[in-house]
């Protein structure tokens, strides 16, 4: 099985090197800055055991496609993918990429939510912030929270996120929240995402807009850029499967309005391709970005 996996990696790397530049009119730019959410390859490196077995081949294949940075998605008790922060950073840099950010989450307990005392959860965050600083992260992003029952609970979470953001800022990192589609539901008449943006400090909390989930939630990324300019420091560029293949996400409009959004960088996530097909999905997505004239070399 591992031999087959290696052969697939080699084949995809060969396609990456030649596939997008087969004609003389190709506008491929090999040095565009684009990061990848490693959750895309979760079936290959998504836990400590898989990471230990496959990370060298997978990370090299991703780097060979033109990806320049990574966002992690496996943190537990001071370790990233089962290795120390320093080891993880070295693994990424060994293939020529850099560590950008990480998805981690610590939900409030019912007692904390009721009392507004976050002491226990903030101790967890202090350890996580120290680990992510050691890994060279620029950002930490909370990837999920459930829809709360009341606005009071949602306000408590906003205060919690402000405090996490304050601690990240003190450590020299940014803190953000990543949306899915459920944040467009209403809580006591208020759209959850709008309420969160309005009740978090822009100096402490940015929003990592996942453009696919915004569209899936029947909203417009560009309308949100215009409504809350500067709040979307990092974007998740995602589609139903490979980037640019579904036709449902207007990536040209999104990138053409990146300055209004406040976008400093973007991260590609291919969530709909599983197992070894994730590698091919990442290649197709990288080629789409490299050949799209509306995507600048850097932001």
Regions found by a protein language model. Give the residues of each.
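Histidine-acidic metal/acid-base catalytic patches
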Residues: 2, 21-65, 190-209, 213-299
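N-terminal pre-domain/capping segments
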Residues: 21-135, 287, 291-299
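C-terminal motif of bacterial Sec signal peptides marking the signal peptidase cleavage site
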Residues: 16-19
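Active-site acidic/histidine proton-transfer and metal-coordination neighborhood
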Residues: 98, 110-206, 279
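Sec-dependent signal peptide recognition
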Residues: 2-10
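Acidic-and-aromatic substrate-binding clefts and catalytic sites of carbohydrate-active enzymes
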Residues: 42-51, 72-84, 106-122, 146-155, ...
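Short acidic/polar active-site loop segments enriched in Thr and Asp
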Residues: 68, 98, 138-139, 233, ...
